[in-house]
Amino acid sequence: MAIGVKRNAGSSSDGTEDSDFSTDLEHTDSSESDGTSRRSARVTRSSARLSQSSQDSSPVRNLPSFGTEEPAYSTRRVTRSQQQPTPVTPKKYPLRQTRSSGSETEQAVDFSDRETKNTADHDESPPRTPTGNAPSSESDIDISSPNVSHDESIAKDMSLKDSGSDLSHRPKRRRFHESYNFNMKCPTPGCNSLGHLTGKHERHFSISGCPLYHNLSADECKVRAQSRDKQIEERMLSHRQDDNNRHATRHQAPTERQLRYKEKVAELRKKRNSGLSKEQKEKYMEHRQTYGNTREPLLENLTSEYDLDLFRRAQARASEDLEKLRLQGQITEGSNMIKTIAFGRYELDTWYHSPYPEEYARLGRLYMCEFCLKYMKSQTILRRHMAKCVWKHPPGDEIYRKGSISVFEVDGKKNKIYCQNLCLLAKLFLDHKTLYYDVEPFLFYVMTEADNTGCHLIGYFSKEKNSFLNYNVSCILTMPQYMRQGYGKMLIDFSYLLSKVEEKVGSPERPLSDLGLISYRSYWKEVLLRYLHNFQGKEISIKEISQETAVNPVDIVSTLQALQMLKYWKGKHLVLKRQDLIDEWIAKEAKRSNSNKTMDPSCLKWTPPKGT
């Protein structure tokens, strides 16, 4: 065996090292067919703390270089501490045993004389790691036990080699869309999943991002995306210029550019076609008969080009938001989200996830009794339930009735199951709702429409029994089949009607959903314009408006600011009575045919509850 001089590779930069002895043994493996004739196995032993008997049994016990009076320097590679310009006094360390390509005799060598020279020429390279790089430390040397056998060392080397050879079989890293589903494809018939409605992606896997569904090509989507980006850059540049030219005032008037843009939009909307020609109608009918619901209807010439362009931008933005959610893993194929619900004579598409039990959520389609709100798994179960269900209206007390419209007050403590089912149903259409099961501290006001089959759910709102912040609404919902018919405003009006009876000033609990915020702003605007239309005095008080309408003063001020009716002049706050807005509101009220979509205070039979 050849024995050379070598420093341990695991020594620290300050010149300290472990004084372990390592002996490399050479072995011949004749069973391998690849021609490998030698393998090295490193066996660790105890270091300077070995007893004298073990030193006597060492194979190098008779070497003259191991004198106890003259310690020797071990050779090693240059470390960071030795590369510094300041001279370092060399320390002396006990000589280590290793293999050398030179003579078989050992000698003490001063490392300070050979700090730029390698100590030995190795006849074979060190074993490779699974990544193909040589080990830089003692990571591949087992120092846990001094009695490691030779067979275990060979087995370890073989496992390292096998693990390195298996790396080529690892699957490639998936990119982009493959990161959330590898086998997805667009559900539109005839679509190859190429392109995206936003023009920013190469592939799509949903109808919302399908160019073919929107009667476009992938190239057209890219051109539109470039046009949108260019318009956004121009708008941002113009906003910066406006900000630089403006002075900091409390109420900033519109700039000249904004006024010109408003006039331009008004002119573009005047160019709207009065109607479709006969050829266009035939073209639209042919398109509908050919593709049915698998393609978007043709939208050209239905409205002005400006409004159609706004709609296309909104579509692209919504598609981009959905794509981000999919890439983040929030929307995945096969996720436990109910897609549709069978509710009475309607089939409703859901908007958000609701925490129904897993055995129901995984179905994708839920069947629900529209009277007791019990949810079921199949049409057969629903049919059997409807045959024996005795409920035809919500539980609780009917506190309002005018015509076919009724409102029921349901106590969450007395009718816990019904209120929990109502909250789970509402979560399918509300994003910010967090109340599902703790319904006892709340009262629910359910609005229904009656016919010969029963009282059908229109919507509801809930409120705390004891609200310290005077919230008159905690959650409000209008069912999708009754939206855009005035029922949402009726629910809001009814909540303020209850506040008037309680002689309180109320406000909805925040945050509001997007549709809820639109409804409340429209209601506050209507209330203020009606009040100003009937007001004949010269001085007005926000507090008086609040007490008469039961609207919170903060909501009144924000609405006046949005209408540009609140000004600050010569140290005083002024409310401008804009007659143009009042006349516009009067004209809209005259055109409304559904005058019955209002709440009549005389039809309310209710007294405020005392305590809980």
From Swiss-Prot:
<keyword id="KW-0007">Acetylation</keyword>
<feature type="modified residue" description="Phosphoserine">
    <location>
        <position position="51"/>
    </location>
</feature>
<dbReference type="GO" id="GO:0072720">
    <property type="term" value="P:response to dithiothreitol"/>
</dbReference>
<dbReference type="GO" id="GO:0072710">
    <property type="term" value="P:response to hydroxyurea"/>
</dbReference>
<feature type="modified residue" description="Phosphoserine">
    <location>
        <position position="112"/>
    </location>
</feature>
<dbReference type="GO" id="GO:0003682">
    <property type="term" value="F:chromatin binding"/>
</dbReference>
<dbReference type="GO" id="GO:0006355">
    <property type="term" value="P:regulation of DNA-templated transcription"/>
</dbReference>
<dbReference type="InterPro" id="IPR050603">
    <property type="entry name" value="MYST_HAT"/>
</dbReference>
<dbReference type="GO" id="GO:0005694">
    <property type="term" value="C:chromosome"/>
</dbReference>
<keyword id="KW-0235">DNA replication</keyword>
<dbReference type="InterPro" id="IPR016181">
    <property type="entry name" value="Acyl_CoA_acyltransferase"/>
</dbReference>
<dbReference type="GO" id="GO:0031098">
    <property type="term" value="P:stress-activated protein kinase signaling cascade"/>
</dbReference>
<feature type="modified residue" description="Phosphoserine">
    <location>
        <position position="11"/>
    </location>
</feature>
<feature type="compositionally biased region" description="Basic and acidic residues">
    <location>
        <begin position="111"/>
        <end position="126"/>
    </location>
</feature>
<feature type="modified residue" description="Phosphothreonine">
    <location>
        <position position="129"/>
    </location>
</feature>
<dbReference type="GO" id="GO:0003712">
    <property type="term" value="F:transcription coregulator activity"/>
</dbReference>
<dbReference type="GO" id="GO:0030217">
    <property type="term" value="P:T cell differentiation"/>
</dbReference>
<dbReference type="GO" id="GO:0036409">
    <property type="term" value="C:histone H3-K14 acetyltransferase complex"/>
</dbReference>
<feature type="binding site">
    <location>
        <position position="385"/>
    </location>
    <ligand>
        <name>Zn(2+) 2</name>
    </ligand>
</feature>
<dbReference type="GO" id="GO:0072716">
    <property type="term" value="P:response to actinomycin D"/>
</dbReference>
<feature type="modified residue" description="Phosphoserine">
    <location>
        <position position="65"/>
    </location>
</feature>
<feature type="modified residue" description="Phosphothreonine; by CDK1">
    <location>
        <position position="86"/>
    </location>
</feature>
<dbReference type="GO" id="GO:0010485">
    <property type="term" value="F:histone H4 acetyltransferase activity"/>
</dbReference>
<dbReference type="GO" id="GO:1900182">
    <property type="term" value="P:positive regulation of protein localization to nucleus"/>
</dbReference>
<dbReference type="GO" id="GO:0004402">
    <property type="term" value="F:histone acetyltransferase activity"/>
</dbReference>
<keyword id="KW-0597">Phosphoprotein</keyword>
<dbReference type="GO" id="GO:0006281">
    <property type="term" value="P:DNA repair"/>
</dbReference>
<feature type="zinc finger region" description="CCHHC-type">
    <location>
        <begin position="177"/>
        <end position="220"/>
    </location>
</feature>
<keyword id="KW-0804">Transcription</keyword>
<comment type="function">
    <text>Catalytic subunit of histone acetyltransferase HBO1 complexes, which specifically mediate acetylation of histone H3 at 'Lys-14' (H3K14ac), thereby regulating various processes, such as gene transcription, protein ubiquitination, immune regulation, stem cell pluripotent and self-renewal maintenance and embryonic development. Some complexes also catalyze acetylation of histone H4 at 'Lys-5', 'Lys-8' and 'Lys-12' (H4K5ac, H4K8ac and H4K12ac, respectively), regulating DNA replication initiation, regulating DNA replication initiation.</text>
</comment>
<feature type="modified residue" description="Phosphoserine">
    <location>
        <position position="179"/>
    </location>
</feature>
<dbReference type="GO" id="GO:2000278">
    <property type="term" value="P:regulation of DNA biosynthetic process"/>
</dbReference>
<comment type="similarity">
    <text>Belongs to the MYST (SAS/MOZ) family.</text>
</comment>
<keyword id="KW-0479">Metal-binding</keyword>
<feature type="binding site">
    <location>
        <begin position="476"/>
        <end position="478"/>
    </location>
    <ligand>
        <name>acetyl-CoA</name>
    </ligand>
</feature>
<dbReference type="GO" id="GO:0006275">
    <property type="term" value="P:regulation of DNA replication"/>
</dbReference>
<keyword id="KW-0963">Cytoplasm</keyword>
<keyword id="KW-0539">Nucleus</keyword>
<feature type="modified residue" description="Phosphoserine">
    <location>
        <position position="507"/>
    </location>
</feature>
<feature type="binding site">
    <location>
        <position position="210"/>
    </location>
    <ligand>
        <name>Zn(2+) 1</name>
    </ligand>
</feature>
<feature type="binding site">
    <location>
        <position position="522"/>
    </location>
    <ligand>
        <name>acetyl-CoA</name>
    </ligand>
</feature>
<dbReference type="GO" id="GO:0032786">
    <property type="term" value="P:positive regulation of DNA-templated transcription, elongation"/>
</dbReference>
